[in-house]
Amino acid sequence: IMTEYAHSRTGIDIHPGADIGSYFFIDHGTGVVVGETTKIGDHVKLYQGVTLGALSPRGGHHVTGKRHPTVENGATIYSGASIFGGRTVIGENSVVGGNAFLTTSVQPNTRVVIRAPETSFKNA
């Protein structure tokens, strides 16, 4: 009941089973989702719209064990990033840029940047 109340008031959905370290910080938290088996280290920062979720099993099979990612100490994950899977680890002091989509691990001290295609404007 408390989880649903907190979600309705903040727009942040953190499963009560998530393992969260000290000094966890969410800035502009609307749309943040943290799954049940997520492990978050100390001094981690998340920004709006970040999802730490599970990959969907094939064929509707139920998956047991760790299904959500691990975020190690000192990592920062920027707006709109989606990180999925129980084997996915965001290494210590890494930075995941906005709108990244990850299903594989990131080594410690890595910067993940998504480069958008060029945007052009033409007169009508």
Protein language model annotation of sequence segments:
Residues 60-68:
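Regulatory activation segment
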